[in-house]
């Protein structure tokens, strides 16, 4: 997924793209064939091509584009083992957690790995993500996905209940975590465990679908020496735009020549002719108008952010 190469090689994971609603993830193996309603494509004919190439099917009747895997495309094409976070929330989380190359982060739970992949790209190559998941089957799938996408060196998956006694403690974590993300039914129960691995100034984010969860989380954060507590909801509002013809009001007197104070009958007749020839049509213009669509994507969840400042 973080492959900088422009040329497709054996073993690369690619996306066969035929539109936003028709994508397939493939691992390049020279002996395999990809079959779709747009035709058949032999992997050996794809290997060696540049990412972004337009490919013709074996019979020449169809085509598709082969593009490199990204966390955004992975969020669209992955198997939804759980409800996932989408790109709008993910970008907001990464920005407000102040993640960057070299950051060390903790996440719970792992789920389908959508957010994990985006965090890994942000903190690579010097940073690391420790993600915790209580569901053993999801842990196995996540480890396989991260390995297949080339992210396993940046992500460590642990099978554990983040609200339990051990929490986020590991031998390779020692109060050096820069950011913690919680996507749990009761995130307030994991805040003490989060504090155990955070340092002064670390950021915490909690994702909760219900406002009652937000209220309990904020109360716990306020009692646990967190500052700068805020909760936001991110929604897309799409606008429809179009050009509208309208008539501009003409406030000038057509019978007066402003360039000549000594008006005469010739000026009056000349200006009257110009106005009558142009008429109303000569005053029409186009203006760009917009209005929001009546239907929009609804609520996903609330994002609560806070900074740990124990000495403040």
From Swiss-Prot:
Cell compartments where the protein resides: Nucleus
Pfam entry (one): GCD14
Protein name per the record: tRNA (adenine(58)-N(1))-methyltransferase catalytic subunit trmt61a
GO biological process, one term: tRNA methylation
Keyword terms of this UniProt record: Methyltransferase, Nucleus, S-adenosyl-L-methionine, Transferase, tRNA processing
Main location: nucleus
Taxonomic lineage from the root: Eukaryota, Amoebozoa, Evosea, Eumycetozoa, Dictyostelia
Superkingdom field: Eukaryota
Modes of activity regulation: Inhibited by calcium and magnesium ions and spermidine. Enhanced by KCl, NaCl and NH(4)Cl in concentrations from 0.1-0.25 M. Concentrations of more than 0.3 M are inhibitory.
Enzyme class: transferase
SUPFAM superfamilies linked to this entry: S-adenosyl-L-methionine-dependent methyltransferases (SSF53335)
Gene3D superfamilies to which the protein is assigned, alphabetical: 3.10.330.20, Vaccinia Virus protein VP39 (3.40.50.150)
Function: Catalytic subunit of tRNA (adenine-N(1)-)-methyltransferase, which catalyzes the formation of N(1)-methyladenine at position 58 (m1A58) in initiator methionyl-tRNA.
Binding-site residues, S-adenosyl-L-methionine: 85, 112-114, 133, 138, 161-162, 183
MF terms (GO), sorted A to Z: catalytic activity, acting on RNA; tRNA (adenine(58)-N1)-methyltransferase activity
Entry's family note: Belongs to the class I-like SAM-binding methyltransferase superfamily. TRM61 family.
InterPro entries: SAM-dependent_MTases_sf, TRM61_C, tRNA_MeTrfase_Gcd14
One cellular component term from this protein's GO annotations in UniProt: nucleus
Catalytic activity: adenosine(58) in tRNA + S-adenosyl-L-methionine = N(1)-methyladenosine(58) in tRNA + S-adenosyl-L-homocysteine + H(+)
